[in-house]
Amino acid sequence: MSSNKTSSFVPWKVATILKHQKTLEAVIQKAFLPGDPAEALNSSQFCETTAALDSTAPCKICQCLHQLCTHHSPDLSFYGDYAIICYYALHAPKTMASNLMLLADCLELIQLYFPDAPSPPPNINGLDIYLHFFVNRCFRLANTEKIMEWSNLDMLKTEFLRATLSGSLSGAFCFKTLWPSLTRAPVRMADECTCTPITNPGCGLDGGKLFHPACIGKDNFLDLILIFWKNTDAMTPANSLLADTLSRHQVYFQNLTPVETNASLDPSPALDTTQGPCLLSPALCLQKKNHTSSLCLLCECLASHSEAASVFQTFKHLVLNSINNKVKLLDRILFLQQDADSLSFIQDRELLKSVLVNCSPQEIHKHLFCDPLCALNSSLTDSVVLFGEVPDFEFTAFKATLATGNSLVHRSFQSCEILETLILLFKSLQTVKANKTTVSEIIKEVDASLKKHKFSLLSCYYTFNIYT
């Protein structure tokens, strides 16, 4: 029978990542793409990792937790601890760093409440975490009348993620015909978004007085993220050099070489290490275009550094207001990067400031002014929640309330299934082959949805063509 004991579990701690280093290393080693995608289907390891994207596949995280709870009857505090992980996921950006941290938190939860269960749980990887917490958000309460609408959007997102790995959309796919049937499209472009009935709005707790900022750097793990991508094409040469320097002084995660299977048992192609462990990232692949990559390093900073969100907000303000003339945004960014005094407001000068200075101006331009996923991540990220501190007694009561599910909403950002679906489709289109009609229709819908939600960005038409 379940008991009700007090739990001291707190998500988003770097100590949790380090504690589960061995398991996380194994997950990272299996997150590399084959060098020849055409031969990927011959690899049982690749097929096992990506099986979650099958249109009829169940959620591995849901299945794992359901089986554990059914067979082991955990303490009641388990449900509060799982709910607080979900709450943190709502306030985190959709990045590789977030996927890694959430996986570590889930491993910790299983170890705490199910000590007799197999550890680690078999066949759980970063893609499963991404689908559960960020794509499908399985933990959210849904308006029953809208469950089919919500499910259709999830199926569409899965289809585009699958296309990201295969390289192309199905020839039978027609967005112009399908999209109006999935959403209650407004008649006029200026109408408000119609997405809010999909989830139950207005039932969250005001956690504004609960979380308090912690000391800068207490649970930052940006150094680990840089190390994971040090030998890849994701970063500029200067940031790669910084990552290499960090790696030489770090005793953790030194065994990240991808696992090569026995050719006689699994005739898999050689793995592409230049793309890094990209199956842990939302992009599921690594592409470069005009000095940017499909892995946004600044978004990774949001998830892994407590100061990043405020720094980028201040930097954006400086870009927009430091010059009165009509100087291009890229030039403004360059001027600030080259002026040491202009970045003196950054407290973490050794790491965060170095990363920002080492980024290409195009990376910063894309993140601050162009990319819809970067804009969404900036709105979702709440550093006070992710890196803040909460009194133990209040935190225990807060977790118990969250366990009912009614309060699992963002503190300040209005959830929008339609917007998040369109952004995922847009990002997938940047890496897959699709007909021009599909591309233009999706870009039009993304631009319209961004305007409805008060995002001020350059047209997605330009972002689609110049960046990745």
Swiss-Prot record:
Region (Zinc finger 1): 59-138
Keywords, in A-Z order: Host cytoplasm, Host nucleus, Metal-binding, Zinc, Zinc-finger
Ranges where the record places region Zinc finger 2: 296-374
Keyword Zinc-finger in record: yes
Annotated InterPro entries: Herpes_env
Location (main, coarse): host cell
Cell compartment(s), UniProt: Host cytoplasm; Host nucleus
GO cellular component, one term: host cell cytoplasm
GO MF annotations in UniProt: zinc ion binding
Sequence positions that bind Zn(2+) 2: C296, C299, H367, C374
Superkingdom to which the source organism belongs: Viruses
Annotated Zn(2+) 1 binding sites: C59, C62, H132, C138
Function of the protein: Plays a role in efficient localization of neo-synthesized capsids to nuclear replication compartments, thereby controlling cleavage and packaging of virus genomic DNA.
Family per similarity comment: Belongs to the herpesviridae UL32 protein family.
Protein name, entry field: Packaging protein UL32 homolog
Organism the protein comes from: Alcelaphine herpesvirus 1 (strain C500)
